[in-house]
Each structure stands twice: as C-alpha cells, then as structure tokens.
Amino acid sequence: MVAGVFLGAILCAAAAPFPEKPITVIVPFAAGGGSDTFVRIFLKAIREHDLAPQPFVVKNIGGAGGTIGSRAALKAAPDGYTILCLHDGMYTAQHYGNADWGPADFTPIAATGRSGVVVAVVENSPYKDLAELMADAVARPYQLVYGTNLGAPNHYSALFLQHGKPGAKFRFTQTGGGAKRLAQLKGGHVDVTGFSVAEYEPFKEAGIRALAVLSEEREAALPDLPTAREQEVDAIHGLMQFWWAPKGTPPDRVAYLEKLLRRVMETSTVQARLAQLHVDPEFHVGDDLQDVIQERSRELEGLQLEKPAALPPVHWLVLGFVGLCAVWVWREDKPA
C-alpha cells in the first residue's frame, strides 16, 4: 500500500503542469547592460502577449565576467525553474581559464539572435582602414594596444582579428565593458577596440570611427562599412545569445521552454526591438543548436592565447615599498 501511495505521488508530480510557479532567468551581469536589456525584451513579450501561465523574473548576478552568475545557474536545481541567458561568454570563460565549466555542463535550450562586431579607432587615428591597422600590427608586434575585457567575447573578437592576419600581434589590455572601452579609446589609452553593432550605433557620434565589421557580409545597419575579409583579413566573429538550463533538467520542460522562446521570437515586440538593436533574429534549437554550439567551440581551438604575466598581490607590493622606505630612512639617520 505504501508503495502504491509513493508511486501515485511520483505519477502526480510527473503529470503536474509546468510551470506552476515563477521561472527565474539568471542574467550574469549588472542591470542595465546589454545582456540584461536583451532578456527583458523577451520577458516583456511574454507578459504582453500572455505566452506563459507564470511570470518570468530576472535575477541579476553580476561579477567576474559573468562567471559568478553562470556558476549559480550551474548549481541550481535542474527542475526548469531556474535558467540562464548567457552569450558566447559561456565558451570564452572556460577557454581562457576563468571558469572550469562550459557548454557541456548545461542543457542548451535555444540560441536567439546574433550581433555583429565592429573594430573601431578614435576619429583622428592615423589608420584609415583595417588593412593599415593590421599592417602596422605586423610591422610593430605588441605595440598597438587593443582594449578588451580579458576572457570575454570582445577579447575573443580581437583574437580572431589577430589570427586573421599572419604575423599580427596586439597588446591586449583590460578595459571592461563598452562604455569603459569608449572612454579608454577617446582618452588615447588604447589604439583600437571592438564594439557590438548595437554598442557602436550610439557611440559613433562620440568621436570614434569604425574600420571594419567582423561579419560574413556587411551589416544592414552599416552598409558602407566593409568586412574584414574585404580588407584581406580572414576574421569572422559575432555574438550569439544562448539560453541554458542546468544539466539534468527534464526534457519535457526543456521542450516547453524551447517552444516558448520560439513563440516569443515571433512576436512583433521582439522583432521590432531586435531590429532597433541591430540584432539578427537567428533562432536555433535541437540538432541545429547542437551544431552551432559545437562549431563555436571548435572555432576557439585554433586561437593562440598569450596571457599577461600575473603581478604579485597588491599587499605584498605595498609591504615591499614600505620596507624599502624604512631601510632608506634608517640609512639616512645612521650616524656616520
């Protein structure tokens, strides 16, 4: 009898409608950023078009280039009530060594949208096109400073650019997000940096100039901007947005989320906003999604990483400096 009751409880749980409570979407970056904006567009469409019986709630867990949030998703219960939206940072953090987990440690739900990447310099830069920039990167290796967020997708866009011109070498420096990269570029602290097309649009009036886009074809938003390949640099890279569930999430719940995201992508709300943000409305699920994930993982294998040498901890530097000062004062005060 007890066994029958237990079996009945299992069957009832399996037959329970999903979702029965709000679903949390972890955004592994601060509120107001590009990823946060992207997710909120989708959740707004779910509400406005009444596509789900329960609300979807954003939970921002920023820090460490998205790895704190992705780790939280990794450890979440695999019940479909906690999911993650994270772009190619899922791949790059693992490849760079910032995380010991990656795509294989999650169940992919869907890929929704691709953004092009623009290579930009300050308006008065001596480089008139990408060919000139890359020729100088070959002639003077490690002299041109490329502003990036080390280990993040924009860093990998720069690595693909460098890889696309044999002999080219940039000196990569940590600058942070788009607004910080813009400030570093305008301030003359870096020679070149990269932005998504969506980032570049509002920035282009701020005294910067695009040299190329790292897409297979010219971007509709920037029809006069040539691709890298048009300038004899074999570099293609873009930013894809992915939705992930914890490993072990029941297939029927993953299927529900997949179908929901497909319906969301088809809404006028999302289509209009993605167009405004210059995001291509690509949509990948199932075997197609697996192919995309495997291809993007393979693309990283041929990249050469040159990590900056680690500096000693700051407190040791301070102690060393204080010690030197103490010795100098002691020697000055010592009687002759």
Residue ranges and their predicted role:
Residues 1-10:
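Bacterial N-terminal signal peptides
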Residues 11-15:
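Sec/Tat signal peptide C-region and signal peptidase I cleavage site
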Residues 16-105, 150, 154, 164-194, ...:
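N-terminal (or domain-start) structured segment
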Residues 20-22, 252-325:
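An extracytoplasmic/periplasmic, membrane-proximal ligand-sensing/linker region
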Residues 72-82, 95-180, 230-233, 240-273:
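Hinge/capping helix and adjacent helix->loop/strand transition within the periplasmic-binding protein
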Residues 88-90, 114, 124, 197-198, ...:
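Solvent-exposed coil/turn segments that connect beta secondary-structure elements
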Residues 104-112, 147, 169-173, 191, ...:
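Short beta-strand->loop
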Residues 323-336:
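C-terminal membrane-anchoring or membrane-association module
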